[in-house]
Amino acid sequence: MKLSLLAIAAIAPFVSAHYFFDTLIIDGQESSPNQYVRSNTRAAKYNPTKWVNTRDNMTPDMPDFRCNKGAFTFAGQTGTAEVKAGSKLALKLGVGATMKHPGPALVYMSKAPSTAKTYQGDGDWFKIYEEGVCDKNKDLKSDAWCSWDKDRVEFTIPADLPDGEYLIRPEHIGVHGAHAGEAEFYYSCAQVKVVGGGNGNPGPTVKFPGAYKKDDPSFNFSIYGGYKEYPMPGPEVWSGASGSKSYSKVVNVNAADATSEGTFGHREHARDFNY
């Protein structure tokens, strides 16, 4: 589903507050909106999913939490992009939005039994990327987070991932209201066919819904009152994946270090390091 210029203009005032992923980028080549990313049937495409003060009767406990409300109805008309294992991908937000909520970004994948177009996402999901806090010396209510004000989540398809068709699920979690149980989830699903892969065994795996619980510390976290370590949600990043960017356990990180890839760039299982 393509948005008209009039629709984009109507949405524009709201995109800094709410947003949606609709564009797949493969090795720097940007596709068209929803060419490879399933759309949704939300009253407004950018509506978040929440447990409290819900919109569109959607909560993280529903099957549509896999790819968003009504997304499977778009699966057949959504293309499946061929991507090489080891290639660099990104999922970009629609209509010029940026992630102007504090919180982590994550990327999950799930292998389709046959084709991505016919897969509802009811199988096993594994995490290939996550990013949390990049600089503990900045404001936890804003730019301390790696994803702050970015328009995309960038990651690498694991080189050892077996060939086949997959769903890729990018997710950004706004935690500005998490202290009151109102974490906001922004997510969608891209359809891809992985080629040139290996014999890896992705895991640990989870199911959606089920991977997240309303009382998880990740979704009842307060960004107020100074820095505190954020407990990343979901399973560990698959060890065969290229890495993560999250420095919430780094004791002394200055701004220069936090932005230097040579010192603190993408790191595998960054949250597991003991400092």
Swiss-Prot record:
Lignocellulose is the most abundant polymeric composite on Earth and is a recalcitrant but promising renewable substrate for industrial biotechnology applications. Together with cellobiose dehydrogenases (CDHs) an enzymatic system capable of oxidative cellulose cleavage is formed, which increases the efficiency of cellulases and put LPMOs at focus of biofuel research. Its EC number is 1.14.99.56. Pfam families: AA9. Disulfide bonds join C67-C189. GO terms for molecular function: metal ion binding; monooxygenase activity. O2 binds at H176. The keyword Signal applies. Lytic polysaccharide monooxygenase (LPMO) that depolymerizes crystalline and amorphous polysaccharides via the oxidation of scissile alpha- or beta-(1-4)-glycosidic bonds, yielding C1 or C4 oxidation products. Catalysis by LPMOs requires the reduction of the active-site copper from Cu(II) to Cu(I) by a reducing agent and H(2)O(2) or O(2) as a cosubstrate. This is AA9 family lytic polysaccharide monooxygenase D. It comes from Aspergillus tamarii.
